[in-house]
Amino acid sequence: MDFYRALSDYYDEIFPLKGPQKTFLQDYIRRESLTSVLDIGCGTGTFAIETSNTGVRVLGVDLSEEMVEISNKKAKKIGSTASFSLADMRDLSRINEEFDGVFCLGNTLAHVSGDIELKEVLTQFGKKGTHLLLQTVNYDRILAKQVKELPMIKTAHLTFYRHYTFRPDGLLDFNMKIEFMDSREVVSGTNLLYPIKVDRLKKTLLETGWEVSGQWGNFDKDAWTEESPATVLAARRIPR
């Protein structure tokens, strides 16, 4: 089995929606009075479908055809109003609508190639919405402690392994492996990531017309520290 097909098929089992994520999204949507959301890097549509359950109009986009296919099937099966289409966060020109909010969660943003592309992507986000919610791995912690391995995830059917390789150019090779319990089949893949530290992210947000309105270390809304597992930032577009 191809690694990315396997990851798509078992994504919801590996990364199920948790209570704090659900509560955070509901609170954020209510606080910012959002009526429409563009979910960039939507994966299998978990956040998009959950957001649509609050009555918000949602379009989820992803670079993976497999993810979009699964998202559409999930939405149809449960009668969700969320819609999904194929798009790359680096080029959102085919999306003609504007939205109240733009979500870029699940470490999607770290797939930019560096500072220049980060600036280009955040500028594009500002053309699609007035409120922005970002979530990445806390790369301040990863870089400071030279973390080479993330916690192993075990489910009823598989074990998911994740390792970092630190590259001389400052990027990270994110090495992933899925081992299936029954068949003992092993599939693996590698993604290239740009480890965005929080100060760099906040500086680039300001440079691209965004003002940070909230910062947390997880979806429980704990204060962000260098030890936090994640970086969660909310921002509002600065009026021109």
Indicate residue ranges for each PLM-predicted region:
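Class I SAM-dependent methyltransferase SAM/SAH-binding core
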Residues: G45-D91
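C-terminal lobe and adjacent flexible extensions of AdoMet/dcAdoMet transferase-like proteins
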Residues: R200-R240
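Conserved class I S-adenosyl-L-methionine
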Residues: M1-E32, L34-G43
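SAM-dependent methyltransferase
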Residues: L133-T204
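A short SAM/SAH-binding and catalytic strip from SAM-dependent methyltransferases
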Residues: D100-I116
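Short conserved loop adjoining the S-adenosyl-L-methionine
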Residues: D91-E97
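A short glycine-rich, Lys/Arg-flanked "PGG" loop and its adjoining helix->strand segment in the class I
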Residues: E117-H131
